[in-house]
C-alpha cells in the first residue's frame, strides 16, 4: 500500500480528541510511509490531518471539486491539489489514487463517502481495506447499525467483516497491513428471500 484515502470532517468537531487523532493519524501515515489522499480542504479535521502529514514530510494529494474551492477553502500547501468538476469525480479520483480508505469523525459527507466505498467493496469493485477510526466511541452507533443490518439480513456477515474498526491510528494501520478481503461467492442469500 502506498496511499490511503481519509474521509473526515471539514469541521474540527466538538471534542479535542477528534483533532488530536487527526494529527496522530497524519503523523502515523507519514511515519509508515503512506501518502495521504483526502478532500483537499485546509479547514477542520481535513486541514489538521493534511498539515500533520506535511509536517512529518509525507506526501499529500488533495482532490476538491471546483464548486468547493472557495466554500471549503482549498489547502494550497499540498504535494498536489487536483481540482475536479464534480463530487462524483472527486470520490472516483480519490478511490483511484488510494490503496485503502479510513474514516475519521465527520458528518454526512464522511458517512456518504465511507458507505460508497463499502458498497463498492461489497459489489466486488475493489478489495481495498475500509476502516473506521472510532475515536471515543464516535462510530459506536454506526457500528451498531451495521450489526443490526446483519441481524436483519440486509448485510451478510462476510460483507460486515469488510470494515476494520480500531481506536488508534497505529492499530488501524497494522490491521490494514495484514488485511485480506473476504472472498464472497454470493451477496444475496436466496434462502432468506
Please report, for each region that a protein language model flagged, where it lies by residue.
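A cross-family phosphate/adenosyl-ligand binding-site feature
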Residues: 1-97, 135-170, 174-175, 179-193
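Gly/Pro- and small hydrophobic-enriched strand-loop and loop-to-helix capping segments
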Residues: 59-61, 123-134
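Active-site/ligand-binding-proximal alpha/beta "capping" segment
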Residues: 90-124, 131, 183-187
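Flexible, glycine/proline-enriched loop segments at strand-loop-helix junctions
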Residues: 104-105, 129-133, 160-163
Amino acid at each position: 500500500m502506498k496511499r490511503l484515502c481519509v474521509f473526515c470532517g471539514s469541521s474540527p468537531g466538538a471534542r479535542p480528541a477528534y483533532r488530536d487523532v487527526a494529527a496522530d493519524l497524519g503523523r502515523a501515515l507519514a511515519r509508515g510511509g503512506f501518502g495521504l489522499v483526502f478532500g483537499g480542504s485546509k479547514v477542520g479535521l481535513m486541514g489538521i490531518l493534511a498539515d500533520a502529514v506535511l509536517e512529518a514530510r509525507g506526501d499529500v494529494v488533495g482532490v476538491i471539486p471546483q464548486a468547493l474551492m472557495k466554500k471549503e477553502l482549498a489547502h494550497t500547501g499540498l504535494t498536489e491539489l487536483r481540482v475536479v468538476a464534480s463530487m462524483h469525480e472527486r470520490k472516483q479520483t480519490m478511490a483511484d489514487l488510494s490503496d485503502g480508505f479510513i474514516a475519521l469523525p465527520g458528518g454526512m459527507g464522511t458517512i456518504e463517502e465511507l458507505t460508497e466505498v463499502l458498497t463498492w467493496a461489497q459489489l466486488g469493485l475493489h478489495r481495498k481495506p475500509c476502516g473506521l477510526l472510532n475515536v471515543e466511541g464516535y462510530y459506536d452507533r454506526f457500528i451498531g447499525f451495521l450489526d443490526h443490518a446483519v441481524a436483519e439480513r440486509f448485510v451478510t456477515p462476510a460483507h460486515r467483516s469488510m470494515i476494520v474498526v480500531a481506536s488508534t491510528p497505529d492499530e488501524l494501520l497494522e490491521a490494514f497491513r495484514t488485511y485480506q478481503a473476504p472472498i464472497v461467492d454470493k451477496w444475496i442469500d436466496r434462502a432468506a428471500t
